[in-house]
Amino acid sequence: MGTVDAYLRQPWSTVHAIPMVSAFAQNWERVDNFQSRPDDIVVATFPKSGTTWISEIVDMILQGGDPKKCKRDAIVNRVPMLEFAAPGQMPAGTEQLENMPSPRIIKTHIPADILPKSFWDKSCKMIYVGRNAKDVAVSYYHFDLMNKLHPHPGTWDQYLEAFMAGKVAYGSWFDHVRGYWERRQEHPILYLFYEDMKEDLRREVAKVAQFLGRELTEVALDAIAHHTSFEAMRDNPSTNYSVVPSQLMDHGISPFMRKGITGDWKNHFTVAQSAHFDQYYAQKMAGTDLRFRTHI
């Protein structure tokens, strides 16, 4: 399976009963057996929930708020994605991470219950970002249109049903957001919300810095909030994924950084779809105190 054609637009594979990107699922042992280090910082999200955004924020905090240092390399190299693989095109995430000096920032979308055991055993700090399900579904649909590592999403209606049923990469959004939420009692997890970041980015950056034990000046906090605005990141070649080969991601179909707003779901969901989704959501989120905002 070394050629690109062997894994582009292929159906999902399955890893530990979770749907997974075909290219990533090959040789999953490298992920299961991955050895963490106690000072690793894990950035975890369900896809399309602000992963690149929080990754850039964490890197900037570690660099003391210096934007020049964050332009030293593309985000995919500064914050490797643990499970990523695109044989013959780009290095695997596990390979990149093994060669990185500490402290490493490790990005992942892997659900909590199948995250490599080593991260839990070593009590690595984790930063999780949750985003409301309706906006995630819309963003993920557009992402799957342009990301050839995923199968074609079909129509929006078909995709929404698949999303609700957990038949998308990384499985159920509901299980994912709850999985990390429930583990935060016993594990050092800072649980953030995309909507809070949109509302007051500087406040949320300060939370992350405090969680990581990093003292930042007011000037550094301002610099990070400015540098990590959606507009700045969309126009920054080191964060906008323009380095990813067009064979894998076609930015002409939909840019990797598309809108970065809360409430775009209203432009896609019909009234009937929204009502159907809300009913299903209430069932799946029963019994948890985890709450999301669908508008700000």
Swiss-Prot record:
Residues the entry annotates as binding substrate: K107, T108, H109
Coiled coil segments of this chain: none
Keyword set, alphabetical order: Cytoplasm, Transferase
Disulphide-bridged cysteine pairs: none
Functional description taken from the UniProt entry: Sulfotransferase that utilizes 3'-phospho-5'-adenylyl sulfate (PAPS) as sulfonate donor to catalyze the sulfate conjugation of dopamine, small phenols such as 1-naphthol and p-nitrophenol and thyroid hormones, including 3,3'-diiodothyronine, triidothyronine (T3) and reverse triiodothyronine (rT3).
Protein name stated in the entry: Sulfotransferase 1B1
Gene name of the record: SULT1B1
GO molecular function, one term: aryl sulfotransferase activity
Class of the enzyme per the UniProt entry, highest EC level: transferase
EC numbers on record: 2.8.2.1
A Pfam family this chain is assigned to: Sulfotransfer_1
